[in-house]
């Protein structure tokens, strides 16, 4: 991952990975790659962004995390994403093993025994691709997760997606058009944490008063 390879009960806040290329080459079913973290269990992600990244793996690939594994035996609780987004990311998985796994998603490639909660977040313009495996059910793409394993569920609260090439595993998120992402509609729905910036919403930072200060100085 761009921030960490492995997270266990960790909290990651105010982090962005932009214009990066990440690749995981180990060819087995534990191969994970994501813009922020490769493998996470019980992680808390807040105000994190992944933009214009290229993720390549040989099993699990995600815009944020390659695999989210919240097995109750670990005792660290379920993962959450709040005020997060992925935009313009290309995520691909290509296994050399015909019995292998090839799963990619806008937030996570694989969810294992997870009740993932995603709040006030979105996925936009995700290019998702899988190759190589001949096993039905383990070659898949999805908006927020490529594949849900075991008792995994996605709980969305005020979430959106668009231009992902799929509607699978979107939970209860609402699909929006490219125009709605570009014209400020989605930014308004996401509230004060976001502001329109170019073609899609980005985090709303401190106000810039430099022009006001300059005028007062005159």
Residue ranges and their predicted role:
Residues 1-218:
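Predominantly extracellular beta-rich ligand-binding scaffolds that present long acidic/polar faces
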